[in-house]
């Protein structure tokens, strides 16, 4: 489709984005930017998690470094995040005075009782990185994941950086761009990513190694609410399957139905808050809501679970939040 597209001496090969499925508009915009050598200082890749935003960002930077062509050496360095001119910023947990990236938290046993954040000191590091001269690339490259997880101070610092972008290239990957400051969105070139059809999802999942995708589809066939939660996102389905498997079997069985007595509610609140990390608890709420919505149950129950989610996100003590919510659900 894009083979041979060239302008100003830069030819963009089709193979560069061959792994990106179901995103023709986003792919066309990125190919045109490379082919015309007209890059914005900041991009906002918006759309659901798990539909190719991160992959597109990596291939876009690879195209920049490789003159529009697939560049295996640069690809490896970018994917391993060890390129000297790449800074990858993601939400962090504050653990014993250290900031632990979300991607590393589980492997080193960091508690995830509270949601991770993009912090002011991370944005300051980002600004310093973009201000320095790149070592091997035409410009400094920054990928910022989940910018909607920024606190107010971090968001204001990022806005100041966007007002004076210098010669760097910043890519924001956001599943909730509406939660960003309007002034941040307006200073970025938006590239929208959409949900995939089920056929496209199956094609993507079938290419995963070790039959991971096939196993996920088998589980989703037995539990269709997982496919509904994924809503056109292969990556989201894999994450829902991971979270499903991470919940202890005995607790998962008890979560199949809402409690009917105060004793059941209090016992379930205790076990959920003690046995599950914060991200697992939020997932249980989403899973419950999907089941309740499918069953056309009372809307007040869905609203009560919405309040529970907000309480957990606002750092209310988890056991107390679950006790209040589950007791209220008995009479709903």
Where are these regions (language model features)?
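Structural recognition of the conserved hydrophobic beta-strand(s) that form the central parallel beta-sheet
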Residues: 142-145, 158, 168-175
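Conserved alpha-helical scaffold flanking the Walker A/P-loop in AAA+ ATPase domains
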Residues: 29-34, 99, 103-141, 149, ...
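Conserved ASCE/P-loop NTPase catalytic core
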Residues: 40-46, 83-91, 133
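AAA+/P-loop NTPase substrate/partner-engagement loops
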Residues: 72-98, 178
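Charged, glycine-rich active-site and insertion segments that engage polyanionic ligands
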Residues: 2-78, 131, 167-169, 174-332
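Conserved Walker B
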Residues: 146-150, 165, 177
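Conserved D-loop-proximal element of ABC-family nucleotide-binding domains
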Residues: 151-153, 182
């Amino acid at each position: 489709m894009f083979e041979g597209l060239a302008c100003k001496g830069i030819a963009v090969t089709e193979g560069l984005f061959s792994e990106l499925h179901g995103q023709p508009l986003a792919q066309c915009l990125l190919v045109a930017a490379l082919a015309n050598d007209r890059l914005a200082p900041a991009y906002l890749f918006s759309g659901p998690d798990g539909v190719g935003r991160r992959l597109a960002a990596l291939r876009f930077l690879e195209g920049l470094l490789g003159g529009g062509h697939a560049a295996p050496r640069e690809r490896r360095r970018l994917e391993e995040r060890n390129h000297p001119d790449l800074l990858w910023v993601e939400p962090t947990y504050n653990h014993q005075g250290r900031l632990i990236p979300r991607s590393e938290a589980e492997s080193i046993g960091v508690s995830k009782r509270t949601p991770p954040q993009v912090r002011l000191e991370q944005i300051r590091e980002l600004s310093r990185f973009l201000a320095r001269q790149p070592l091997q690339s035409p410009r400094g490259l920054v990928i910022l994941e989940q910018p909607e997880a920024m606190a107010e101070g971090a968001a204001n610092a990022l806005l100041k950086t966007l007002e004076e972008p210098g010669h760097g290239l910043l890519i924001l990957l956001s599943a909730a761009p509406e939660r960003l400051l309007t002034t941040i969105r307006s200073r970025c070139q938006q590239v929208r990513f959409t949900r995939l059809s089920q056929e496209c999802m199956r094609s993507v999942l079938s290419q995963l190694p070790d039959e991971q995708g096939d196993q996920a589809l088998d589980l989703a066939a037995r539990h269709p609410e997982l496919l509904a939660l994924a809503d056109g996102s292969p990556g989201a389905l894999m994450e829902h399957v991971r979270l499903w498997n991470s919940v202890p079997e005995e607790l998962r069985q008890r979560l199949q139905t809402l409690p009917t007595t105060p004793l059941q509610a209090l016992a379930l609140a205790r076990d959920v808050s003690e046995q599950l990390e914060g991200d697992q608890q939020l997932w249980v709420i989403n899973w419950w809501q999907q089941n309740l919505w499918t069953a056309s149950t009372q809307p007040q129950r869905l609203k009560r679970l919405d309040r529970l989610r907000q309480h957990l996100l606002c750092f209310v003590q988890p056991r107390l939040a679950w006790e209040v919510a589950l007791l209220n659900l008995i009479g709903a």
